[in-house]
Amino acid sequence: MWLFVGPQLLAGIGQVTKQYADLLEAEYCQVGQRPKRAGYDRGFAFVLPIKEQLDLFDQYRAFCPEWTYMTVCETEPVNDCYGLLERYPEIHVPSEFSRQILEKQFPKIKWSLLRHWSESKVPRGVTSVTPYVFYSIGNILDPRKNIKKLIEAYLRCEFRDAAHLVLKATCTQPVEWRVPGVTIINGLLSPAELEKVHATSHCYVNCSHSEGVGMGAVEAALRSKPVVITDYGGLKEYVKTPWVVPCTTGPIGFDDFLFKKEHNWGHPDSVVLQAHLEDCFQKKVVAWDHSHTRELMDEVTRWPGWRQCSS
């Protein structure tokens, strides 16, 4: 029996850890809370290189004789504090992008690949393309998500009433922006409510500076949506699409959480982003074949590590 430990579910890494737990029909425990049982066969924790957080996770070690640890990164290089993870001999990452960066900077750790997982869904057909709905899911206040540039590109398209942009915010505080043609959905949604967001939208857009993975786009692909992505980070390993926005690699330019201003990430081409939005809108693309994404999800279900104990 597995125990999965992670942060609150509004956090992206909380969601992906919970999805692993759902895959194995196992318990998900939010860090800081007590597990339901006294002991488990194996534990899984998604960790970031923050000493206080790592000390919290260490309090769970007694519940499981064996642990699997995972982390992620979005810049090159990464913060030196990732060296704190050397307390773990092996750490899994969800993309080759992350593995190559971390392996180069911290060779003492064994970095192994374990893809993120989400359940494949039977796509629900959208009955109308008027208005044509673009959408994106994530922490829209996070500068890495580059949402203001997405809004600017969308407004330059001048779709007027023929299109709409829906932003599902996964922020800890409500976002009250007032932008014509843009709807912001705040708060943690139930699975059924989130499914409705997918079902009533047409085209998913990710224009992040970088993604360790970018599960919103992956989940849209698993619902056969057309997806616009950027080419810096791990997302392009998960989603194959003709609507890829090229990035120029360069410094972030400011300090933010684990990011330093001298670290590099991608700067998406706003002209190409706008062109991709216009192309999907003009062609009214509402479905796309994402066989590659589905195959990756199937591979995750067969990961040998899951079989090291019963679920």
Locate each region found by the language model.
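Acidic anion/phosphate-binding donor-loop and adjacent secondary structure
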Residues: 79-80, 113, 117-132
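Extended catalytic core of nucleotide-activated donor transferases of GT-like folds
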Residues: 3, 27-103, 192-193
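Conserved donor-binding/catalytic core segment of Leloir-type glycosyltransferases
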Residues: 125-145, 151-155, 165-166
